[in-house]
Amino acid sequence: MPVTDNDRVYTVMLARYSATEQNDTFPGFDFVGALDVKSPEGAAYARRQLRHLTRIWGGQRVKDDPAAADTLTMIRTIASRMDGHPVVFAGEIYDEIDRFAPFATAMDFDNPGLLVGSRDQIVEKVMIALDITPQVVREAVSRGASLIISHHPVIFDPLRTLPEAHPAYMMAHHRLTAICAHTNLDMAPGGVNTCLAEALGLQNCRPFAWYHDLPEGLLGTLPTPQSAEAFARYVRDRLGGGVQWVDGGRTVHTVALCGGAGGNLTTQAVQAGADAFVTGEVRHHQLLEAQAAGLTLVAAGHYCTERVVLEPLRQRLAEAFPAVEFMCAETVSDPAHTIA
């Protein structure tokens, strides 16, 4: 019967000399199999050893140490014995996201994926954020998260330098992993556009614009028609941010939407017969185009039209990985301020 004392587990072992040479890098590894990792004490001890081995493995990888492969094998061996106390790797979470929002479906200009760290990162806590900023990295470290999942890629354009203040540098320094799901999550079922439609209470949603064979924008109907100004206020109140809007001069019933920077879909929204179009940000000529076409256009902010996906994503992943704690970042906010 093991006895615990803080982070140590004591038990009685009977060993005999066998003259077999033991790998002195990790003495006692053969005894790991004798530990009952299904017991609360054994599981807690095994998790501590996994974290310790993961730190060692990370250092070995940085130094290109040939022993890194053996250490990773040891990590996976211990993890495989923890029935009922599953160990989750970052790669498994990446694969789960890839199932419902395939990374290969991202737009050509995009850079989603596992951008910092390793698939073999052991994950107990995950932070979810729209952007990976220095503040978010510091929050992840303080709250014990080893993986950050963001919507916007932490590395988007090619880097010519990597200063210490860059979030990717900070993540590597703290041995964190980053998975970024951008336009693949925008267009996925249950992704940004779906969540935006739900936030606005739209019904009977269907695609109105396509990127290859994927829905780039959705079209739905309001339960109750509204005037253009009332609809703009409705969007503001539903999404919680300031809005710019063009008065289309007619009652709004059918609404097109695209989260983020969707102003390029203005023409298609008109062609689809929408009374209004909701997106995050638009250009001046797109405002003029909407005005000329009698389309009420509401630019509700990039941040506000995309943050709607964060909590549903957290819930979805928490259901898939109940042993992992998923939490939304608290230090990220809309960088754009509105003065009424």
Provide a role label for each language-model segment.
Residues 86-340:
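Hydrophobic structural segments
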Residues 1-86:
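Class I S-adenosyl-L-methionine
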